[in-house]
Amino acid sequence: MTDKSHQCVIIGIAGASASGKSLIASTLYRELRDQVGDEHIGVIPEDSYYKDQSHLSMEERVKTNYDHPNAMDHSLLFQHLQMIKNGTPIDLPVYSYVDHTRTQDTIHIEPKKVIILEGILLLTDARLREAMNFSIFVDTPLDICLMRRIKRDVNERGRSMDSVMAQYQKTVRPMFLQFIEPSKQYADIIVPRGGKNRIAIDILKAKISQFFE
């Protein structure tokens, strides 16, 4: 964990898939943006850095273990974080959950005072941990995560319930136990109940607001 307040502040939010990370990140972003303006705060999802699989067939893509650190291009993410800290804009990759690969599009992101970084595997990478000013782990029971994941993936990502359940049993739960849950030890703050924990969100808002003073 670094403390370089004169640079861009990187705040990491990790936890299981469908634990409420994105809800916390979006709530913090929306409420702080209303206070300081969107030119001062932004969000980067780790999912944008899934490796490009355009060279693989769709059959091969669906076999990828997306819950293993090797599925992520953390080197590119780390490079982009360093660029932002040095005042250089980045072009954020855009990942398609339907096609299981990156699209040709990118999103231009200018350096901000605060960047909220959210994703399941952020705390498994020592380089990313070092780049963060502080980190949060969203600690939500796996059965709740599973129910949320089924609803999300079926309604928003074009998945069938059978495929979601098969992936959960084959990779999501085992990888959580092997990689994600152990990475909780590196978090500075542990938040139970995800985005429903209003007290935790208010405490985090107060902490982040200090960086704008």
From Swiss-Prot:
Pfam families from the UniProt entry: PRK
Compartments reported by the entry: Cytoplasm
GO biological process, one term: UMP salvage
Catalytic activity as recorded in UniProt: uridine + ATP = UMP + ADP + H(+); cytidine + ATP = CMP + ADP + H(+)
Keywords: ATP-binding, Cytoplasm, Kinase, Nucleotide-binding, Transferase
Enzyme class: transferase
One annotated Gene Ontology cellular component of this protein: cytoplasm
Leader sequence segment: none
EC numbers, comma separated: 2.7.1.48
Molecular functions (GO terms): ATP binding; cytidine kinase activity; uridine kinase activity
Pathway stated in the Swiss-Prot or TrEMBL entry: Pyrimidine metabolism; CTP biosynthesis via salvage pathway; CTP from cytidine: step 1/3; Pyrimidine metabolism; UMP biosynthesis via salvage pathway; UMP from uridine: step 1/1
Residues where ATP binds: G15, A16, S17, A18, S19, G20, K21, S22
Primary location class: cytoplasm
Family designation: Belongs to the uridine kinase family.
Protein name according to UniProt: Uridine kinase
Species: Enterobacter sp. (strain 638)
Gene: udk
